[in-house]
Structure formats: structure tokens, C-alpha cells
Design a protein with these regions (language model features):
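Conserved helix/coil segment N-terminal to the catalytic DExD/H
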Residues: 1-34, 48-52, 56
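C-terminal accessory region of SF2 helicases/translocases
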Residues: 188-191, 368-510
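Conserved P-loop NTPase motor "coupling/switch" region that bridges the ATPase
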Residues: 34, 42, 51-135, 179-182
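SF2 helicase/translocase ATPase core recognition
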Residues: 44-47, 57-98, 142-171, 296, ...
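Conserved Helicase C-terminal RecA-like lobe
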Residues: 144-162, 170, 182-313, 319-320, ...
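Loop/turn-to-beta-strand initiation segments
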Residues: 8-12, 31-34, 59-63, 78, ...
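Walker B catalytic acidic pair
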Residues: 38-39, 336
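Hydrophobic beta-strand scaffold positions of dinucleotide-using enzymes
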Residues: 14-16, 66, 130, 263, ...
Length: 510
């Protein structure tokens, strides 16, 4: 192949993206019959080196395989389509003017009737063009072969300590920005630092404490809000709303059944807190993060999936192992914090609901009520709705969020049980009670408006564990839905309800 004349002994080459880039010049010299790119969304940016290297192949037959062709915006979708069918959607500039701009304006929560009409027309036109080269298979296929998956979006109240630090961070950032405007200095790096502080604070105050102690930290003045005894305990679930909910869920599960957990976070510092919690409660655990070799990862995954293993929790770094791992030894997964990219969260949450799973699965997404986490989740919802319209040709996908609302990242909404539910303008809930059920056909892929909404009444929550901890004092709202319908015998459901009644000392405990 190196000289372009000798026929390869083996007609198929299996190669990673990284290795391909190393040998791109050699591979460019030969005519290739077909290229198949798994995890095709890695080519979402036409400017990156991997895309350009693959695009240089002498190959007319190109196939991309991806579960998430749209992760953030329509230009990513354009890049994928343009790779397999160059010119089908015009140039990037033409695509933006002809399709992206009218579609996005039409999807805005404040769009006029005329803008919605133009957006729908542009969407239909684009779908007509690309459907000639796209075969779409959704996760609905899995429902024929896998047990039921129950998804829960759990809004958790911050503690008073978290709220006070959160508001001080916002006030300080406003002052810092005003000073930077006067000095005409750039604020991009400081803005990212501010966002990171808010996100970590939502997980646990300990995650920002050490950073704030540094004398050059721009938020150093938040230190006086911490109690003198703050560092007395390495892990104190009572100082974090989400950690408190996690602690309750793990405790009730451990007490009532033999289910195991995967705990996922984007931050290794948070995983450190998981470790301390497991030690505090005496839970067996294994941990996977970016410091592990491939052999080490395979070993601990095999160990955890062994039915005879004693490990109760698998502690997983989303960035290190959110893709490709099969963790069917657990059937419960807690996504402790959100990512900006919905595809990353979806990949991580798919670790337990996979081929070989025999138990019903329970997914819990924890969000700090009214915080930047709910705003991030709203952005995820907006992006997924866009994907539903464009990729899956979804009909009547609701427009819940305007572009202006999605920019309101930093305001802390302390008076609402869920900022997301408030922005849905839900017509099925009256005074915190769901007055009518979603349609029977609704599932985990449906619009949030078609999920169950539980604020004051936990009886409709299918998961007996979450029903049991609903009144722990830290949960303000729960969205919940299932992957598909199965009939549960009435007698069995009554037995579950009886088995998982909250203990008197748990209910209402703070």
C-alpha cells in the first residue's frame, strides 16, 4: 500500500482515529473502496485534523455511524453530512443562511408564527435532502430486548451554606467584571473560573473551599461564610443538598435490596467525595478515572460485574469512562452533575441499560434546584429537541425555552421547586399536584412536558427507593418516565409499596 501499486494482502484495515492521522499520507496514496467511521460524531468539526485527514482519502463510499449526530448545533450535523455527501447542503455559509438560521429562529420559545412557519419549511426541506443518505435507528429498538428503564430528574435543594456562598460568588463576580470593564481587560478566563466555582459548589462546598483559600483567588472573600468546624469531617453529606439525597438513596437501597450502583461525575474531586462517603458508610466500591490503564479498567469492570462481588458502588469519571463500558453488574446509576453536551451525559447514563442486563434499571439525574445546573439541563433539553426535529423528523416538538432564557445562567432561583418545570408552563400541574397523567405512549425520549411531574406527591413514582426518600427534606421536584410499558401485577406492586415504606426516623429528616 505504501507505494500505491501493491495490493494489500488483507483487504480490510481496522485503525483508530489517532493512528490513522499518523499514517494519513501513506493511506492517501491509495484508492480506498469504502471507509466506515464508528463514533462518527468525532467528525463534527470540519476544521479539526482528524476530519481533514479522513477527508483526504481517495474514497467515494463513506459511512458514518453515530448515535448522536447533533450534540450541540446544526453546523456539526452539516459537517457529518458534508463528509459523506460533499456539497449536498451547499457550503457552510449557504447552509447557515438557508437552513440553520431559519430553523433556530423557528425553534426559539419567543418565535413569531411567521418565524415558526419558515423554520418548519426549512426543516422539511433539509430532511428531504438528507433522508436519501441517512438510516436512523433509535433506542426504541432496545426496548424489545432489555428490561424497563426508569429515568428520574431529581431537583435537590441546596443547603443554606451552599446558597449563601452561591450568592456571594455572584455578587463578587459582578464587582470583578465592573472593575475589568474599567480597566478594559479580557474576562474570558475569569468567567470560566466563575462558572467552574458555581458548578463545583452545587456538588459540595468542600470542592471550592481549598481553591478559595488561595490568596490570589478572585473569590477569596467567600471564605468567611464557612463555619469554623467545616474541615472537621472529610465528608459531611449534610452540607450539600445533592450529597444528602445520594446518601439517602444509597442507604435505603442497601437496607432493602441487593441492587448495585454506578456513581458518575465530571469532577475527580467529587469522586473523592464519593470515596469518603463509601468509607463513612462502610460500602464496598471500585473507582475508575483517567489515571488508570486499559488493563486496570478491564480488571475492575470484570470484578464489579461478577455477581459474587461485594462492591456496592462503581465510582466513574464521566470523561474517563463514560463511553463504551458495560457495567451491567449494577442496575442503578446516579448522574451527579450535568455536562454542557447532552450526548456525554447520555453516553454515561447508558452504562447499565445494556445487552446482558437482567434487572429493571433506575437512572437518577441530580440537579441543584434553581442553579446553573438546571440552566445547563435546559440547554441540553433545547439541543435534544433540535435533534429530534432535524434528525428524527419529530412532529410538534414543543418550544419551551427562548434564547434569552438560555442565557440566564447565573441567577439563583431559591423560591421555586424547579426552574425547569416553571419554564415549561405546565398545564397538567395545579398547585404542585399533577392533575392528569402523560399519554400512555410517552417514554424517556418524550418531551419533558410528557413526563410525570412530582412535587408534593410521590405516589406516581414507580421506583420504591425514590418514593421512600422523597420526603428526606432535600428533594424539591422529580420528573420521571419509563423506557417502555410492561404490565406489573397489582399484587406485586402492593408488595413493593409495603416493603419500601419510609422509616419514621427517615421521613422529613434533615
Amino acid at each position: 500500500m505504501a507505494d500505491g501499486r501493491v495490493r494489500a494482502a488483507s483487504p480490510v484495515l481496522i485503525i483508530s482515529y489517532e493512528t490513522f492521522r499518523l499514517y494519513a499520507k501513506i493511506l492517501h496514496s491509495s484508492v480506498i473502496g469504502m471507509v466506515i467511521c464508528d463514533e462518527g460524531h468525532r467528525l463534527k468539526n470540519s476544521d479539526n485534523l482528524t476530519y481533514q485527514a479522513l477527508n483526504g482519502l481517495q474514497c467515494e463510499r463513506r459511512v458514518l455511524i453515530s448515535g448522536t449526530p447533533i450534540q450541540n448545533d446544526l453546523l456539526e450535523y452539516y459537517s457529518l453530512v458534508n463528509f459523506v455527501n460533499p456539497g449536498l447542503l451547499g457550503t457552510a455559509g449557504e447552509f447557515k443562511k438557508r437552513f440553520e438560521n431559519p430553523i433556530l429562529r423557528g425553534r426559539d420559545g419567543n418565535a413569531t408564527d411567521e418565524e415558526q412557519k419558515k423554520g418548519e419549511e426549512a426543516t422539511k426541506e433539509m430532511i428531504t435532502l438528507v433522508e436519501k443518505c441517512i438510516i436512523r435507528r433509535t433506542s426504541a429498538l432496545l426496548t424489545k430486548y432489555l428490561p424497563v428503564k426508569y429515568e428520574h430528574i431529581v431537583c435537590c435543594r441546596n443547603t443554606e451554606l451552599q446558597d449563601s456562598i452561591y450568592n456571594r460568588l455572584i455578587e463578587t463576580e459582578k464587582q470583578n467584571r465592573a472593575m475589568e470593564r474599567e480597566k478594559e481587560t479580557g474576562a474570558t478566563a475569569s468567567a470560566l473560573s466563575f462558572i467552574t466555582h458555581l458548578k463545583k459548589l452545587c456538588n459540595h462546598p468542600y470542592l471550592v473551599y481549598e481553591e478559595l483559600q488561595k490568596s490570589d483567588n478572585r473569590f477569596h472573600n467567600c471564605l468567611d461564610l464557612f463555619p469554623d468546624s467545616f474541615l472537621a469531617k472529610k465528608c459531611d453529606p449534610s452540607t450539600s443538598g445533592k450529597m444528602k439525597v445520594l446518601d439517602y438513596i444509597l442507604a435505603v437501597t442497601r437496607k432493602t435490596c441487593n441492587d448495585k450502583f454506578v456513581l458518575v461525575s465530571n469532577y475527580t474531586q467529587t469522586i473523592d467525595q464519593f470515596v469518603e462517603l463509601c468509607k463513612l458508610r462502610g460500602y464496598g466500591y471500585v473507582r475508575l478515572d483517567g489515571s488508570m490503564s486499559i488493563k486496570q479498567r478491564a480488571k475492575i469492570v470484570e470484578k464489579f460485574n461478577d455477581p459474587e462481588s461485594s462492591e456496592f458502588c462503581f465510582l466513574l469519571s464521566s470523561k474517563a469512562g463514560g463511553c463504551g463500558l458495560n457495567l451491567i453488574g449494577a442496575n442503578r446509576l446516579i448522574m451527579f452533575d450535568p455536562d454542557w453536551n447532552p450526548a456525554n451525559d447520555d453516553q454515561a447514563m447508558a452504562r447499565v441499560w445494556r445487552d446482558g442486563q437482567k434487572k429493571n434499571c433506575f437512572i437518577y439525574r441530580l440537579l441543584a434546584t434553581g442553579s446553573i445546573e438546571e440552566k445547563m439541563f435546559q440547554r441540553q433539553t433545547h439541543k435534544k429537541a433540535l435533534s429530534s426535529c432535524v434528525v428524527d423528523a419529530g412532529q410538534d416538538v414543543a418550544r419551551h425555552f427562548s434564547s434569552d432564557q438560555l442565557k440566564e445562567l447565573f441567577k439563583l432561583e431559591t423560591e421555586t421547586p424547579s426552574d425547569t418545570h416553571m419554564r415549561l408552563k405546565c398545564k397538567r400541574c395545579i398547585n404542585g399536584i399533577e392533575s392528569s397523567d402523560p399519554p400512555e405512549t410517552a417514554d424517556c425520549t418524550s418531551d419533558l412536558a410528557l413526563w410525570h411531574h412530582s412535587q408534593r406527591d410521590a405516589r406516581k413514582i414507580a421506583d420504591p427507593i425514590l418514593r421512600s426518600v422523597f420526603n428526606c427534606g432535600a428533594i424539591s421536584f422529580v420528573f420521571h418516565q419509563k423506557s417502555h410499558n410492561v404490565e406489573v401485577p397489582k399484587k406485586k406492586k402492593e408488595e413493593d409499596d409495603e416493603e419500601y415504606k419510609p422509616c419514621e426516623d427517615e421521613e422529613g429528616e434533615d
